């Protein structure tokens, strides 16, 4: 919740939005969590993961409609996210949390802070205007849609 609060404040600040009408937190779909868990199992002692090994392990389990996005996500995760997280990143992702439930339980908190309607949706169930933004979600980093 703390990281999502900080991320939302940063987005509002960068976009120059003082009075948002609505904020939607779009949490990562199950297959992204599964991919991260697999990456953790494949990581070497330094926390590095071979992209080709991860792709061959994970792609068969990604829903057909998400294959292209899945390949892009895995590539970004291995080449950018893992190096920025540093050694030992796997421990942060070892337990899957129900982000949708946690953020849903915090709707009133966020609504009081930002003074607008707050909703939480899983990227798998995102409505048309949220789909592109939902594709940016990762485990522990929901996509944030502001209007």
Across the structure, where does each feature detected by a protein language model lie?
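Basic, alpha-helical terminal appendages of large translation-related enzymes
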Residues: 1-147
